[in-house]
Amino acid sequence: DFGLDYQVSGRSTAAMAATDALGSLGQLQFDEFTASGSTVSAKLTEALDRDEVDWLLAERDFDEGVAILQTANSVAYGDNVLGYCQLLARSEIGYLFASVDGRLTFRDRNLSNTSLASFGGSGIPFQGISVETGSELLFSRVVVTREGGSATTAVTADAVAWRETNGPLRSLSITGVLLSNDTQSLDLAEYLLALYDSPRYRVRELTVQLEALSSTDQNTVLELDITDMVTVEFTPNDVGDAVVQFLVVQGIRHDITPASHVVTLSLMDAPSPFFRLDSADFGVLDTDILGL
C-alpha cells in the first residue's frame, strides 16, 4: 500500500507499507475440510493448494518434516490459514517463516550443521552483542499432549540436584499438536528437555553495522536467513579466553536510515541434533563443546 501526504509548504511524502508471506496468510480463512497427509510438508501443500488459499508453487519451499502427523484432522470453517500452518510446524518444533527472497518456508528441526558466517575474531566484525544466562529457557519437566492423546512427560533425571543448582523446578507444557501417537509426543518432550534442562551462557542477539563491512561481508550478512547457522567468537570485557558458540538465526531485523543500516540477528542455541561424532565442531568427546 502507498500513502501520500501533501503539505501546504509543498513538501510531500510518500509512505509504503508492505507485508510478507506470513502477513498475507494471516488474512486468509479456510472453508471446512478434513485434512489428509501424514507429514508437515504434505499438509502444508494440501492447505495452500485449496481454492480459498491458492498459494503459488514458486512461492513455497518446504522440508518434508521428521514427524508423522494425524492423517484425518478436521479444519473448521473460518479457521485462520496462518494459524493452521503454524500449528503444523509447531507439531514437530519446526520453523515456518518468510525467507529473505519472500517465499513461505518450512524447515524441520534437523537443521544443517554448516556455519554460513563467522562473526568476531578473524570473521565479520560486529557492533554489539547481548548475552543471557537467565531462566527463561530453563525447564526441569516438559509435558507434550497431542490432539486426542494423553499427556506425556519427560523429567530431569535428578530433581533434587537440579533444584539445588537451578532453583525451583520449572515446567514447559505444549498442547494440541497433531502428532499421530503418544510415543512421538514423548519423543518430542524428551527432545525439548535435552535442549532446555541445563543453564547455558548464550548469545541472544548480535548487531552489525552494514556499511562498515566489505562488499563480500555485506553480501554474507544479507544472504543469511532464519534457521541458518553462524559462528560467534567474543571475549567478554576482553578478559580471559575467547568464547566460541555455534548458533542458529531465529530472527533478522533491519534498521535503515539515510546514514546507517544496522542488521540485528536474534540467535538461539544449536539444537541437540547438531551432534556429529568425530566432527571438529559438534562431536568432540571429552570436551564441553556439546554444551555450547
Task: Pin down the residues of each PLM region.
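Short, solvent-exposed secondary-structure boundary/capping segments
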Residues: 2-20, 253-269
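Charged- and aromatic-enriched interaction segments used to assemble
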Residues: 5-136, 242
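Acidic, small/polar-enriched beta strand-loop surface segments
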Residues: 37, 83-248, 253-259, 264, ...
